């Protein structure tokens, strides 16, 4: 086995492990959600359409070219289009996680959200792991406009909410993207737990200090 083949096999196993962890801990249900990562050759490895994150076969993961061509494995999710848009427009993005996790999806369904940044920082980890979290308007799943909107937002952001749909998070590795996704989900949970209680938000100076 070549060095590249060994790296690819390791990444396949990592994807199935992380996906299974999401499923086992309740972040994903049924066949909802999808993950992807960039391979060293520039191709994309992604979870197949209709697949359960808790029961993936490393050898059946979808391999997709940078132009969207399906190369091998099972058929990719139609949502791979917006994964590709993120990779093309943010060179730091090496992996993408999209889930329908309970708290973040609930947050995406609320009216009156600030579309430029859904989560006003109230913990340091919001700033350190996510930064701003812009809201993409509702479109039917698979609609090309999701990819178009994410492409416009990708350069300056790494976490997003799709309205009435769920979260999308990037990372410089699949593990980092997974960690960022969990931080977003836990932050959304805190928002609902706090409810209408007065929140002590971070000041502009405190946010600047975290970003420095």
Positions of the model-derived regions?
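Glycine-rich flexible loops
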Residues: 1-212
């Amino acid at each position: 086995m070549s060095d590249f083949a060994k790296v690819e096999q390791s990444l396949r196993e990592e994807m199935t492990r992380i996906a299974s962890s999401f499923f086992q801990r309740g972040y994903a249900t049924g066949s909802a959600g999808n993950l992807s990562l960039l391979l060293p050759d520039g191709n994309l490895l992604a979870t197949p359409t209709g697949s359960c994150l808790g029961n993936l076969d490393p050898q059946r993961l979808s391999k997709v070219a940078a132009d969207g061509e399906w190369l091998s494995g099972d058929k990719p999710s139609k949502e791979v289009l917006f994964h590709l848009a993120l990779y093309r427009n943010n060179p730091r993005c090496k992996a993408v996680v999209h889930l329908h996790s309970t708290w973040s999806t609930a947050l995406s369904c609320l009216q009156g959200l600030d579309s430029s940044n859904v989560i006003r920082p109230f913990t340091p980890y919001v700033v350190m792991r996510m930064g701003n979290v812009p809201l993409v308007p509702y479109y039917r799943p698979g609609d090309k406009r999701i990819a178009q909107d994410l492409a416009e937002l990708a350069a300056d952001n790494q976490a997003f909410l799709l309205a009435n749909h769920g979260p999308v998070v990037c990372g410089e590795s699949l593990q980092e993207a997974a960690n960022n996704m969990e931080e977003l989900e836990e932050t959304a949970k805190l928002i609902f737990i706090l409810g209408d209680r007065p929140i002590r938000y971070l000041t502009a100076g405190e946010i600047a200090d975290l970003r420095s």
